[in-house]
Amino acid sequence: KIVLTPDLLEYMCRLNKETGEFVKKITKFYFDFHWEWEHIIGCVINDPLAVAYFINPELCKGFDFYVQIETEGISLGQSVVDSMNFYRKASNARVLTEVDVYGFFQMFLSRILDQEPEELDILQDLIRGDLK
């Protein structure tokens, strides 16, 4: 759900040209990758979400489960979540299932663009796609 869209990227450039252009440059590969493999017009930015969640855990909701990372075979690198407690092992991870998209982008953009959150006046419309 945390996708840096072309509209959000352009908004960043308008608010802080230097930072916006830098973000555009470093995310170009990811924009191309997500389009080629997933047909997403944008760049999924999970790493900033992880940092934002560390700062404000109320941005996300989820559940605690036992999780193991597969280290071989066709599912190499995938997370295996025991959501039904089949293995009866203690939870070792929190699996996040919901995110406050607006809250995240408000925090993210205000910090990297050096803007007060209330100065991001059209952010909610950009996220919802309501701009005309």
PLM feature segments, named:
Residues 1-132:
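N-terminal acidic, glycine/proline-rich low-complexity segments
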